[in-house]
From Swiss-Prot:
EC number: 2.3.2.6
Keyword vocabulary terms for this entry: Acyltransferase, Cytoplasm, Transferase
Single GO biological process annotation from the record: protein catabolic process
UniProt entry tagged with the keyword Cytoplasm: yes
First-listed, main subcellular location of the protein, grouped into a coarse class: cytoplasm
GO molecular function terms attached to this record: leucyl-tRNA--protein transferase activity
Record's protein name: Leucyl/phenylalanyl-tRNA--protein transferase
């Protein structure tokens, strides 16, 4: 039986998420890590070099302008867990306003971005990509600012990578994650309501919070 978007959202509500072994594998399996990566929304680490680049950049930040393009960018690597079924499901969730992308543009060219799923005040980050230096870091900084502004309480990164840890992400136990997840899912939040801010404005806001 084919997986439906509603079943996928029920899975997120219980703390599990889907992956495929590789892009050509038609099957999907469920993942429930013993240790979960999260990004504390008030703990984003912005290095001096990233701050300088964001203050000087000509990149534009856009929301949901090319969701499918962001998913394609995330899958455009030698080894990816994003197969055709995952593309299908998340494009449906996007059409239902349950999955969103934050995009980094250079003129008319999409050069980076991140996409994920929203449920209550929880944001489940799925994947990100970069075609310019630090474009994914800029996307994450702008995403953290947007989630804070929209009333989100949980930014789930699934796993803790070295890249995410350098930006302030941490790892918590499954039990700790479940508690935070249930609290976040019970709260309202909005991904689309906050105003769109430039990288320069985001630097100022994050600096004021640190």
């Amino acid at each position: 039986m084919r997986l439906t978007p509603d079943v996928l959202m029920q899975a997120y509500a219980t703390g599990i998420f889907p992956m495929a072994e590789h892009r050509d594998d038609p099957d999907i399996f469920w993942v429930d890590p013993l240790r979960r990566g999260i990004m504390p929304l008030r703990g984003f680490h912005m290095s001096r070099s990233l701050r300088r680049q964001m203050l000087r950049t000509a990149f534009d930040i856009r929301i949901d302008q090319d969701f499918a393009g962001v998913v394609d960018g995330c899958a455009d690597r030698a080894d990816t867990w994003i197969n055709d079924e995952i593309r299908r499901l998340y494009n449906i969730l996007h059409a239902q306003d349950r999955a969103h992308s934050l995009e980094v543009w250079e003129g008319d060219t999409l050069v980076g971005g991140v996409y994920g799923v929203t449920l209550g005040a929880a944001f489940f980050g799925e994947s990100m990509f970069s075609r310019r230096s630090n474009a994914s870091k800029i996307a994450l900084a702008c995403l953290v600012d947007r989630l804070l502004d929209g009333g989100f309480a949980l930014f789930d990164t699934q796993f803790l990578t070295e890249h995410l840890a350098s930006l302030g992400a941490i790892e918590i136990s499954r039990a700790q994650y479940q508690k935070r997840l249930q609290e976040a899912c019970a709260r309202p939040a909005s991904f689309l309501n906050p105003p769109l801010r430039s990288p320069q404005e985001v630097v100022q806001r994050i600096t004021q919070m640190s």
